[in-house]
A protein has these predicted regions:
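NTP/phosphate- and nucleic-acid-binding module
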Residues: 1-521
């Protein structure tokens, strides 16, 4: 195992996101890792809900014959399986496959339930574990067992399905850039790289610091290919001249725990991982310089102001410095450090994970304007409580109500001030870690117009992506591994268009597109 991967594993283990499983390519999700994945689920579920997508759960074990049937109809669809062939001493008449993907299950279900055009669209998503045979495994990047979500939809028309494919692709771009703070390479998959059976596949990828690409999400338009193969039909409102049922048009789209690998590879420093705020298990870490009743009370009051955030007190170790290191290794985006000085001056000290040396001080002392408002509020409150004491409350009861009301208003002042500063720092934090990712990506994309230049850069060990004029011809693409071993077309750019008469650098045919060529996990 090389040093770079050792460092990567160390970051994952020290952050509490990962622990190696007992079998090759498996892993244990410690609390931090699972919470991060659940935060990703929550973000995406909110996006899916906008379209009326509903979550479902399908079986893990799939009859082997389902895949044999699909292989006959879908050229190139032949995933390698984990199979269950025996239960106890009894050999099975038909092997059961541990789910590598769920197309066959969804379409078998659709075949049995869809009847009329009035039931369309079908919009479903599944969060589950899948199993793949991998020779070279890397935590979160290539696993034999991992977590993902896969969405499957059916539509009455091709246009509806194509539009839905595009929408989900855009949602993934938004999620990766804004929630994971990763700069992306997005485009359409080439003929050789698109999903088997798909008419079109769209991808969201990121360029990692080692110069390799990682596919984070895909969205596929299948036309009616899978529905024909699996005999999924519906009765249309407009029957054709023979009155035959119609095949719906389908899509599939998904992302996985690879996202965690991308975060760990991209957002880190010598202290460990740096987690994006949206997905971090703990968004704000509290550290006390010493533990005494005064500081604990001050911490509790400060935490109460921030109940909209995921906060946690880091006090595993006796020394504050060790607790600060612990919070940094776990990648907490923000730290609030409380000591004697903070208590006496009525301030809190804030530190950002991306710039640990910089300290931000927030005062909890009321301004003169706030003090005047509170005095007037208190005077009016006393007068009104006595005037409108319809329930004949005692003096003690009125005093308690009065104190609660004043405390509530004062807490609101303090909360507004603290949250305003924290939101500003969150925005800067997210912007900063995204920009570092974008800067690396932009510096490592190289425009290359001829094969000799490409070959020279590859032989020199230049790491990154090469933007090349490309014909998108399947026969041409299949010879790329012979010319440039370990490289593949990552996607076709939808923003960079090739010049008229520009030629493909591999076969000299006219280029249709610019394509991103690179190595990948």
């Amino acid at each position: 195992m090389n040093k770079q991967l050792d460092d990567y594993n160390k970051i994952l283990c020290e952050s509490g996101l990962f622990f190696p499983g007992p079998t090759k390519g498996s892993f244990i999700f410690p609390p931090n890792g699972l919470i991060l994945w659940q935060n990703i689920q929550n973000i995406l579920n909110q996006k899916f809900a906008k379209y009326g997508i509903k979550n479902v759960s399908l079986p893990t074990l799939i009859p082997y014959s389902f895949f044999q049937k699909e292989k006959q109809h879908i050229q190139g669809f032949s995933p390698e399986f984990f199979q269950v062939q025996q239960i106890g001493e009894k050999k099975l008449t038909e092997s059961l496959v541990l789910r590598p993907t769920s197309e066959v299950l969804f379409y078998d279900w659709f075949r049995q339930t869809l009847r009329s055009y009035q039931e369309l669209p079908f919009l479903y998503n599944q969060w589950c574990q899948v199993f793949r045979t991998e020779k070279n495994t890397k935590p979160f990047l290539r696993n034999t067992e991992f977590f993902w979500q896969e969405g499957h939809t059916l539509h009455e028309t091709a246009k509806e399905a194509q539009e839905f494919t595009w929408k989900m692709w855009q949602e993934y771009q938004n999620y990766v850039e804004n929630s994971l703070c990763l700069a992306i390479i997005a485009g359409r998959k080439s003929e050789n790289e698109k999903f088997a059976g798909a008419v079109e596949s769209y991808t969201v990828e990121c360029l990692l610091p080692d110069g390799q690409c990682l596919q984070l999400a895909t969205s596929h338009y299948f036309g009616d290919n899978f529905c024909r193969a699996m005999n999924v039909e519906f009765q249309s409102v407009n029957k054709d001249k023979d009155g035959q049922p119609q095949h719906p048009f389908s899509t599939s789209w998904g992302t996985s725990t690879r996202a965690i690998g991308a975060i760990a590879k991209t957002h880190n420093d010598k202290l460990g991982i740096i987690l994006p705020f949206d997905v971090a298990p703990v968004q704000i870490a509290f550290v006390l310089r010493e533990e005494n009743e005064g500081l604990i009370n001050y911490y509790q009051k400060t935490k109460d102001l921030l109940n909209t955030f995921r906060c946690q007190l880091y006090n595993k170790y006796k020394q504050a410095k060790s607790n600060i290191i612990h919070a940094d290794k776990e990648g907490c985006p923000l730290k609030i450090i409380i000591g004697k000085n903070e208590l006496e001056q009525k301030i809190i000290t804030l530190a950002r994970r991306d710039d640990v040396k910089r300290k931000i001080t927030i005062s909890l002392e009321n301004s003169e304007t706030e003090k005047n408002f509170l005095r007037n509020f208190e005077n009016n409150l006393v007068e009104n409580l006595e005037k409108y004491n319809l329930e004949n409350k005692t003096k003690e009861q009125l005093t308690t109500e009065h104190e609660k009301a004043v405390d509530s208003v004062e807490k609101g002042f303090k909360g507004d001030k603290v949250i305003k500063v924290i939101k500003q720092e969150i925005a800067e934090f997210q912007k900063n870690i995204y920009q570092k990712s974008a800067n690396f990506r932009d510096k490592h994309i190289f425009l290359v117009n001829n094969f000799s230049e490409l070959e020279k850069k590859v032989n020199e060990g230049v790491k990154g992506l090469f933007l090349i004029p490309f014909c998108n011809n399947l026969d041409c693409e299949k010879i790329i591994p012979q010319k440039i071993p370990a490289y593949s077309i990552r996607c076709l750019s939808l923003t960079e268009k090739s010049e008229e008469k520009e030629k493909c650098i591999f076969c000299s045919s006219l280029a249709d597109n610019y394509a991103y060529l690179g190595r990948s996990y």
